[in-house]
């Protein structure tokens, strides 16, 4: 009986965490003071933090927060190419969240964490580049800089860099927060001091 209450309480807590992360994911694109737009690329510092933290909690929470974050880009009035780029992040989010759920120790070792960031960042960059390519060849993206600069460098490599920065910020935020989160989560950081 007590276990059922605890389980229900955990579910409620996880629901509240998901809702708060969705709210953060929605509001960041709207109010972030650090937005750099080099169409079709946009760098909104912190726009992936809620999603990464949700990935640390569970795949379901990550998926919900990713969709909520996409809504934030719609509400912020970003153009369709940027909104669709936000939507295709679902691929790296689901893969990354399942990875962390199956291998929760991933972020506790430098090599496995670097591999995680690289693989999810590449998925992220490729998915966004594919969406942008569709708009590029459809004529709705300025082609004056050429495909390589516009799609490969700005979107592909730019997304990978943005992914890595937001991931690092997410881990720095998660480290103290995880100590007060008392529900089952996919990731607990156990960094050893030398």
Where are these regions (language model features)?
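Loop-helix junctions at membrane interfaces
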Residues: 1-194
